[in-house]
Amino acid sequence: DERGIDNALLYDKEIFSVLSSKPIRNSLRGDDKTRDILYVKGLYKNSTLHIFVNHWPSNYGGKEASIPKRKLTALLIMKHISLIQEKDKNAEIILLGDFNENPNDENVRLLYDLGFVNLMEPMLGKPETGTYLYRGKDYFYDQIIINSGLKDKYELNVIDQSMYILDLPKYRQQKGKYKRYPYRFWAGNKLLGGYSDHLAIKISIHKIKE
């Protein structure tokens, strides 16, 4: 983006090998710049896995003004997903990252038209639960979204109910004005020495034995 921030995928080369990767240029209208989408195709347990790493346009400048930007991003991803599925209808695909929308917001919901399932959605409405806190309100901006190929009991599958927010006391501020907020590393120019202003999430994937 304009700050030089890019998406990345960290992986253990002992269990995952990259076959190909590329940034998908996310060109918004006008002079707006935002982060590229990182696409990685790799082998996990000798099965092909397609991963899209996302950081959708933020709500900076107002939510209503930013909604069209995220719609363009969603449509761009859907285009690339369709190209993958044209070649392999059983492709196993994961979308993950910071979508700057909740699972039930309009642009994330566009992905469901392709048969994708948001593993974060069942957590909506739980008290004091979320991955991001803004003005005292919890949001579920960080999500993992999978297609039916990862729920079909064939090859790679997400283990049921393995979706988990890494929400331990050390990851949140425990006192002061920002009590309960994720314990971030930086606050403006001030070094807090924490972890992130978002909480991490995780799932477990196993391979169905043939």
Predicted segments — roles?
Residues 1, 12-13, 22-23, 52-57, ...:
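Active-site-proximal beta-strand/loop segments in catalytic clefts of secreted hydrolases
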Residues 1-57:
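Structured beta-strand-rich core segments of catalytic domains in phosphoester-bond hydrolases
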Residues 2-6, 59-61, 100-106, 138:
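Active-site environment of divalent metal-dependent phosphoester hydrolases
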Residues 7, 71-74, 78-81, 108, ...:
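Extracytoplasmic/secreted envelope proteins and their assembly/folding machinery
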Residues 27-28, 60-68, 95-97, 130-132, ...:
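Second-shell loop/turn segments in exported
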Residues 45-75, 79:
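Metal-dependent phosphoester/phosphodiester hydrolase catalytic core
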Residues 73-96:
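His/acidic metal-ligating clusters that form di-metal
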Residues 83-91, 101-210:
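Metal-dependent phosphoester-hydrolase catalytic domains
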